[in-house]
Every structure is written in C-alpha cells, then in structure tokens.
Amino acid sequence: HDRRSPRARFGGSHDYEYSVAPLMGGLILVVGQWREIFWAIAAMSLISLLGTLFLIPESLPQERRHAGGFRTFLHNAGTLLRRRLFVAYMLVNAFSAFALMAYVSASSFVVQEMLGFTSTQYSVSFAINSTGMMAAAFLSARLTRTIHPRRIMRVALAVVSLASFALLIGSLFFDTPAWIVLPAFFFTVAPQGMIFGNGAAMASEQAREFAGTGSAMLGLGFSFSASLAAPLVGIAGTHSSLPMAITMVVGSLISIGCFVLAGRHTPSAQRA
C-alpha cells in the first residue's frame, strides 16, 4: 500500500491550510476590515499561480501524456465513468465533501450566533477541527503501510456518520448545546483526513492510464458537491442548525452507500 501513502501525506499538508486560514482571517479582522481578507486571498492566489507556472514541473512523464485537447478529455472521462469502482470512490469523496462543506458554510453562524462565541473563539475552534483533519491524514499515511485503505475508510466514514447523527439529535431535541455541537463538529471534520486521500488513491488506481483526467474528475466531483451543500444549510436562516445537520447526515449516508457499492465491485482478493 506504499503507493497510496504519498497521496495521503499530500492530503495532510493540504489540510494544514484549513488550520492556518481561520486564524489568519481572525488576525486580519483585528487590524483591518473584511475587504482586506479578499485582498489577502487575491495575493495568495497570485503567488500560487506564479509558483505553478514557473516553479512546479509537470509530474506526468511525456510518454504518458495525451494529446487531442478537450475532445480527448471527454473521451477519457466517458471511459472512466463506465468504471464502477472509479465512480464509486469518486462519489465517496464527493459526498464526504458535501458533508464537510455543510460544516464550513454554516458552522460560523451556529458557533457565533447560536452559541455566542466570538469570532476569535470560532477561529480557534475551526483551527482545532482542521488540525484534527490534518493529523488524521498523516496518521492514515502511516497506517496504510500495514492496513488496507478500505479498513481505514470504513472506520472514518462510520465516525463521521455517528457525529452527524449526534448533531442532528442535538438540533432536534436539545436546542443545539455546545457540549454536543463542538465534539460533533470535531468528529465530523477530523476523520475526513482519512477519507479524502484514501478515496482518491483508490479511485486513481482505476485511472492509471488517464491520470490527469481522473484527477480532474475527482476535483470536479468534490467541488460540485461542495457547491450544492453551501446554499442548503442556510434555508432556515442563521438561527437554526437543523438544515446543516440534515445536510451532513445525508452526505455521510450517501458516502457510506457508495463505499459499500465499491466493496461489492472490488475483487475478493483486494477487499479489506
């Protein structure tokens, strides 16, 4: 399973951004206004663009690259969409992102408007959860040396589902108390570090000859599902956590369903 470890470690380094970003945003608001946050985002985006253009070499060997432009991409994408294992793991990641984006979109309203936390306290809470996701990704990278990724994903998906249901119960019957909300947030967010990297690695194994197309489709599925979650969580306004909890439960359950389907189409010798 060593081939999967680098992707998990890369995911962990990516999760580091989620830990630092809210703290940076809180510091910017202390000395400036919300407009300065967007200037900071623009500056970092420009740095990323320049780094991509001039510092990061193409990692795919020349002999494995495909010519033909968008038409070739569509052909390769169609081929991958007929591979059930690729689609299943792509959807596992996509609906895990659906649940995660529900948290990202609505947690500030829940924590600040409903629980009464300050913006700085919320930023610290968000950073703690993101640090948990980063730590989970790095732990997963080590575990994959001896444990099959499906076993790791199975546990992580179960934890996310239980935490989402705990949040739903807290929203329905306990008026969204902090003693339920904060732990539920942590155990919804942190295990994602064990899901995204492993899910992407399992999907990529089904797209070895179309590595670029497979990566693009994984990113597209992730971004599209995340964009669907964002407007749903605000349906009841800023004083109800119920839409967020329902969205998180739905995302976690569909993700588990896709994971189960992936297991049914996995050769018995490769099952965890």
Language-model features: locations:
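Interfacial helix-cap and linker-helix signal at transmembrane-aqueous boundaries
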Residues: 24-32, 111-112, 143-144, 232-240
